[in-house]
């Protein structure tokens, strides 16, 4: 398919998760806004907690979100399913909040999303970047951590994912607090 406004060849994607508003997100943090200005799309991997977070993010770029274990009907009503599968710049991206325990995670996500090239997840608040050890597979799973609830991590984080011509061009974890 040739590139169009809906299916460009290259996308800059901001990736966030576990914002846990209003406890940890009192409003769009300026550092988060700085990092997300200019992205083409935002992916939120759940635990939004209040839909106003999504409204703030949507003022910067279109948002796709999945439900987290702390999200209720109001976040679901914003349009958040439990899982989501998208094609972005020719890359098949799946989203889920909880990808389960570290042990066997890539295999589990491959079974759950057999057609995905990338799975974005959250829940642990721990940044993660892992690629299948199977050379014939290539599934990559990514967790941006949390920009606002770092837990035992040294910094709050989000991710920049650049997708181009059916491949991941880059993944960068950005410290925002």
Residue map of PLM features:
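Glycine/small-residue-rich loop that forms an oxyanion/phosphate-binding "nest" at active or ligand-binding sites
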Residues: 64, 69-70, 75-95, 100-112
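Binuclear metal-dependent phosphoesterase catalytic core
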Residues: 2-10, 16, 88-89, 111-115, ...
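N-terminal active-site segment of His-dependent metallophosphoesterases
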Residues: 1-63, 71-82, 90, 154-157, ...
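Pre-active-site segment of Zn-dependent metallo-hydrolases
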Residues: 19, 24-35, 95-114
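Residue-level detector of beta-strand structural context in well-folded domains
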Residues: 83-84, 127, 159
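Short, conserved loop/helix-junction motifs that constitute active-site signature segments
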Residues: 57-60, 88, 110-114, 133-136
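Active-site neighborhood of phospho(di)ester-bond hydrolases with catalytic His/Asp-centered motifs
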Residues: 15-17, 41-47, 63-69, 95-97, ...
